[in-house]
Design a protein with these regions (language model features):
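Aromatic-rich peripheral "rim/lid" segments of glycoside hydrolase catalytic domains that contact
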Residues: 77-119
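Conserved structured core elements
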Residues: 52-56, 98, 269, 281
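Short linear, low-complexity motifs centered on an aromatic residue
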Residues: 4, 18, 87-103, 413, ...
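Substrate-binding/catalytic cleft of secreted carbohydrate-active enzymes
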Residues: 1-95
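Short secondary-structure junctions and interdomain/linker hinges
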Residues: 62-69, 111-115, 207
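An exposed, glycine/acidic-rich loop-and-rim segment of catalytic or binding clefts
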Residues: 119-441
Length: 441
């Protein structure tokens, strides 16, 4: 690309007009954009620490980029009041904090000498693109890495999805516990399971008959699942590209506005989603939504987990607890009947630890309807707006354990009943098999 400088000299037409940081992968930086009419330039910070922390964050991103063939990368720092570059563009701003060479060297050493925080099989940014058949062009998606404590996480802006989450086992071996794809193309063109890792809505789960009535008006929605509307419809919020709003080394906020009428829903719905990796090896997921019309909103995350790690295998040996006295039974098309089923004496009683596979094959109509576990557990939590522990999942083999805390009244536990091994995940040649992933929505 060329800088937007009217005085720039004309380059030799035989030369490749490319800068190092534009080697096939771009890192979106707020305030550093080529969109016409938007501010371009260096980001301004009010403290030296913010400059250094941000520099280190982007420098760590380069570690991911440099693993890709034919990719070059750079982080620019403005070290002087006037900067000249070979194409004739100059910047001059005395209000920008300058970064002295000593601090740059120290930051580089800190990044380079840091221990590798994730295995080499981390998904590469160059794999996150897709082809637009109508235009015949390749579009790049963004893949962001977050790090804190023992955790490393990857998130893409397509559907605000969790792509990877690397966590240690009892022996300190780090592996990816998220089941998904390693290429953006498979997410965009729906290679199999559409909702892998996605943020789903406007309404997660099913709307019976694809219609609802609100304030006396009936709204008809697209039916994308056995005559019902599942996870928002044909487009939802998972099949769109979200906008980067804010990012640190351990957190990211993505935003999307679903326009009035999208998938048949009323109102412009603006959503902010924030992922935060905490220092105690936690993942916080926070949602904020505003609308200009009354509209149903029920957002959720649809990450699929396998605590064995990237080698996969059945999740039937995972041990789960759910703090719930009742579940919400469904009919044959998985729409709630309006009843409340007590878990006492049923395969749905996880108030004490049980392996997932221990009772999944029992003769119960709800297991038959769902092909396994795929119900809403009515949680034993107060409606006080605070987070409460409601579920644990552990793998006796690796020692990995996750605890779910929420301020919501329900938890959908899905045991991966419809994976059939017909498509591969992130590991080449390794299909995602029957009940090799679980979701907690």
């Amino acid at each position: 690309h060329t800088y937007p400088n009217p005085c720039m000299r004309i380059l030799d037409s035989a030369m490749v007009n490319v800068l190092g940081e534009y080697g096939g992968i771009g890192r979106p930086v707020e305030g550093h954009t080529w969109d016409i009419g938007r501010k371009w330039g260096y980001i301004q910070y009010d403290t030296e620490k913010k400059v250094t922390d941000t520099y280190c964050m982007y420098a760590r991103d380069l570690i991911d980029i440099k693993q890709n063939d034919w990719c070059a990368a750079a982080v620019y720092t403005q070290t002087t009041d006037v900067e000249g570059e070979v194409n004739g563009f100059y910047t001059y701003d005395r209000e920008v904090l300058k970064v002295d060479a000593k601090r740059v060297r120290e930051a580089n050493e800190a990044v380079i000498n840091a221990p590798l925080e994730a295995p080499v099989q981390i998904v590469r940014p160059s794999a996150f693109h897709y082809k637009d058949p109508s235009a015949g062009v390749r579009n790049q998606l963004n893949l962001y890495a977050l790090r804190n404590g023992d955790l490393t996480m990857q998130v893409t802006d397509f559907g605000a999805r969790v792509i990877s989450l690397f966590a240690p086992d009892r022996n300190g071996n780090i592996d990816d516990i998220i089941v998904g794809y390693g290429e953006g193309e498979k997410y965009v063109h729906n290679a199999g399971e559409r909702f892998l890792g996605a943020t789903v809505g406007r309404v997660a789960n099913r709307i019976g008959g694809g219609r609802f009535t609100l304030d006396g008006v009936t709204y008809n929605l697209p039916k994308n699942n056995n005559g019902q509307t599942l996870h928002g419809g044909l487009l939802g919020i998972d099949m769109v590209v979200w906008k980067l709003k804010e990012r640190t080394d351990s957190s990211i906020t993505l935003s999307y506005t679903a326009p009035d009428g999208q998938d048949g829903f009323p109102g412009n719905l603006s959503i902010d989603l924030t992922y935060i990796l905490t220092s105690d090896n936690g993942l916080d997921i926070a949602y904020k939504a505003t609308t200009d019309k009354a509209t149903p909103v029920n957002l959720s995350n649809h990450a699929f987990y396998n605590l064995h790690g990237s080698k996969g295998g059945t999740i039937l040996d995972h041990v789960i607890t759910i703090n719930a006295d009742k579940v919400t039974p469904v009919d044959k098309v998985l729409i709630p009947t309006g009843e409340h089923l007590a878990v006492e004496g049923t395969p749905f009683d996880f108030r004490q630890p049980h392996a997932i596979g221990e009772r999944i094959g029992e003769n119960h109509p709800q297991l038959a309807f769902c092909g396994g576990y795929d119900l809403n557990w009515e949680l034993n939590v107060p409606s006080d707006g605070n987070l409460h522990s409601v579920c644990t999942v552990s793998d006796p083999t690796t020692g990995r354990k996750m605890e779910i805390l929420t301020d919501q009244p329900g938890l959908q536990f899905y045991s991966g009943n419809f994976f059939d091994g017909s498509y591969c995940g992130k590991v080449e040649g390794q299909p995602i098999g029957y009940r090799e992933a679980l979701a907690l929505e």
